[in-house]
Each structure stands twice: as C-alpha cells, then as structure tokens.
Amino acid sequence: MFQILKADKLIDFMRWSKFAFVLSILMIGASIFTLSTKWLNWGLDFTGGTLIEVGFEQPADLEEIRTALEAKGFGDATVQNFGSARDVMVRLRPRDGVAGEALGNQILSAIKDGTGESVEMRRIEFVGPNVGDELTEAGGLAIIVSLICILIYVSVRFEWRLAAGAVLALAHDVIITLGVFSLMQIEVDLTIVAALLTVVGYSLNDTIVVFDRIRENFRKMRKGEPAEIMNSSITQTLSRTLITSGTTLFVVIALFTQGGAMIDGFATALLLGITVGTYSSIYVASALALKLGITKEHLMPPQVEKEGAEFDEMP
C-alpha cells in the first residue's frame, strides 16, 4: 500500500496536545464571539423571501443586472446564473406590503430598463417566514440528533472516553465552520446544512479509523504508555488520513473554483470542515480521550470465566 511516512517512523503528536488545546479553545472562543455579535447571514430558505428566475436571449451580464436592480432600490438582491449563462436567478428578502407577483413584475421591469434587453419571466416562488422558521429548527435539530446518535454509537462501539472525544471534535468542527461563515457573512441556506452534516460524517469516519487503531494497539502494546500508544496509532493511520483528505480536498477545491455561485457556500463549508476535521481527529478527539485518562483496561475485552473453572482450580 502507498505510504507517505515510513512504517517505522513515530511522531510525538501528544507532545503538542497542550498547544493544540489552547489553539482550539481560541478558535472556538472567537467563533462563539463572532456568532454572538454578527450571527449568521441566513438565506431565503430560512428567512423567507422571493425567488425569481428570468431568461435572456443572450448570455447575461450579472454585474449589469445588479447595477440595474440597485438603481431601482433592490440593492440587497442576490443575482446569479442558474443552469446556463442565459438563465438568471434573483433572490430577495421579504418586503413589507409588496406581494410576490407584484415584486416579480418590478424586478422584471428594472432588469429590462437597466439592460435594454428582452427578458422573459420563467419562474417566481415565495417562501414565507413561517416556513423559514421551520427549516431553521429542522436544520439545527438534524445536527443535534446526529451528534447524539454518534455519541451513543461510539460509546457502544468503543468506550465513553473515546465517544466524548469524538463528539466534542465534531462540535468543534461545526462551531469553527459556522464561526467563519459568520465572520465572512456567507449566506447560509439548506445546502450549507447539508454540507455541515457531510462534514460531521466525514470527520467521524476519519476519527473512527484512528480509534480502531488505538483500540488495537492498546491490546497489542500491553507495556506501552497511553501517550506512546496514541502517538503510534495516529502515526500508523496518518498516511491514510492525509491521502484521503488530500484527494477529497482536490475535488472540493475544484467545486470551489469552478462550481459557480450556486455552490460556493457548499464548497466553502466542505473545504473548512474537512481541513478542521483532519486536525480535530488527531488533536481533539484522540488527545481529549488521553486527557480523560483512558488506559488499556478500558479497551481490553471482558474476561469470561469458563463454566467449571472453579473446579479446575481445586486440588
């Protein structure tokens, strides 16, 4: 199998665990501060609003359309291509006292006046604020339920100290990703929720691989110290982690650079989540389990007494 590191090389990861804890606490603190002051830039899926799709005869100039809408008082409109270069989607936040159909006609007139081109209305949709509130609750609930299920699974599959490390690592990844979204005011829609759930699953998969090797080495290296076994396990799985994360990031970077405005947020969430998740599987999940005092006794299979063993010991 292809290896980035030599099989006999041992990296002392736990030596830097205190520094990593401080770094993680600072990043989480900064993310919570940003979220508490700026919160998130919710998209129409959550706030409600109007979505209008129009068609041009020639490839549309998005900057010209934005300028035309801004001149008519629609400076908050989000303009992007949808499908082909001739199809344009305009998204607007709710406006008091203006019906969805009337707003669509105003947008269409503004685009025609500003660009001087023939424009056809393709579709108009209105998302009410009540639907947005329901989606917000459902999205948050989906992430919370997934973390609870992961806690139960890892506790049964491994041990509660490892489960605590895994769940806190996942929460760490989600909070930092949301913190960056809050800082940069990237619009959060349903695709971002999907990306966060993808990050949770991806990060967990990486953590489970490391945990499986930790459990195996605790049973094999009976005389080794816990920190030594952790270092050995992470080093042994590091090539797999780097290769998997690297190839995934190549695809995500392609989406980020070539995917267009429609999936910018999705690709950004994956890019951040996978990068932070690779770090957290080593320095949050594993290091936290070590701090909680995990030993080989916690991972050894229970001894089952054979029936009649007490009679075998009798003289």
Predicted features and spans:
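A structural signal for conserved, well-ordered secondary-structure elements
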Residues: 1-315
